[in-house]
């Protein structure tokens, strides 16, 4: 177990429903920070991808091995002192707690000292649905529009968690710059 303050790495997790722009923003943010970008979709098993393609929402049983793989990857990077940007839906608090657990010094509820920071890309169902329809027509993703409502139903963003929130209607450049400012301010109060 790491001693307190041995962890020098940081994770900025871009969260939200499918179609919010997590991967686009995450890649841009990773480039701006000169750090690695991880897409949680790359950690999904083939069976999870197949379920989603068929319009079947994942259960917690489906998600747990996926989240644990992500947690393991993040923990290694944090212990190596790396900064990394992660695009991950992170819809429920319990999922975010698993990801926060990648910080060996994290104590449940100590959100401000955790090395994993969450940024929620917020948008209404109509805006996100239009994005998913465009993406589906370009065959760019396995997640169908039919699962969007189930994602909105799962989304939890408790104020006490100190999740940064930003609107998806802003340009990607403005979103990235805003995230950079928010993260800098949170690291240097």
Curated annotation (Swiss-Prot):
* Pathway connected to this protein: Carbohydrate acid metabolism; D-gluconate degradation
EC assignment:
2.7.1.12
A GO molecular function held by the record: gluconokinase activity
Major enzyme class? transferase
What keywords were assigned to this record?
Answer: ATP-binding, Gluconate utilization, Hydrolase, Kinase, Nucleotide-binding, Transferase
> What SUPFAM superfamilies would the database entry show?
P-loop containing nucleoside triphosphate hydrolases (SSF52540)
Any idea which positions bind ATP?
A: 16-23
Question: Would the keyword Nucleotide-binding turn up in this protein's UniProt record?
Answer: yes
Task: Name the chain's protein.
Answer: Gluconokinase
